[in-house]
């Protein structure tokens, strides 16, 4: 398991104990979990059984065993819709720009059926003159600035060898301050049909499946680049790939995207309710509270992840 240090639990304003039975498996640390509630921190237990940690929490969600990933995907769907699309959180968006690969560009690979799939990252070496990057351009990822220019922001792996003092992730390129673009929605040249694998329809003796196509085609804003080789390729941002994978409607005529939480499409709360057994309004509530607290406190929401969710295949992918 990989969780915030127990002494840091007291700094949190919202804690989810996900598959971690703190009083039983972390007895010496359990007092931090109970004491933090005295300052108003809300605690949530996510575990199929009413374990010891559930009695220490304000609310208990009981997904069917092995369905934690479905619950997590639905919570992510709610958070992305509420805090990235409906009412964008400056704190969340700035965090994504500074500390994640979400602004980076990904090449789309063509399929025989006319659709595409995500390929590898775009590198500075793919572009004419390598964006002026002479040191390790094959290892430097690329993004668009808000001015619509291609840049190689500081901090990717290519900056960590041969260039002193460029280890930190920064919104800088060629020595200049720059703000990175997360989505290509306003810069797009065309809308690409991109395939994503779907595993929620696989039959399982322990919980219900929700049959859909094994490959879900989503429509993403894409930009066409001419590479140094002369080849013309479509690229998308990691951010747009994430939003599409979570099934969020971007107004691009995407029939597999959901515009409402009540639609039974991957990965809405209504979809997750059928698989996990957790009422969708509880999924919406906990996801919103967790993210809203993080938004207002600049990150004081924590998840204590227990080994219990790893006892099923792929549960460590939450």
Predicted regions and their residues:
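A short helix->loop->beta-strand "cap" motif at the edges of active sites that frequently abuts
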Residues: 35-43
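Acidic catalytic cores of enzymes that act on phosphate-bearing nucleotides/polynucleotides
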Residues: 282-285, 291-318
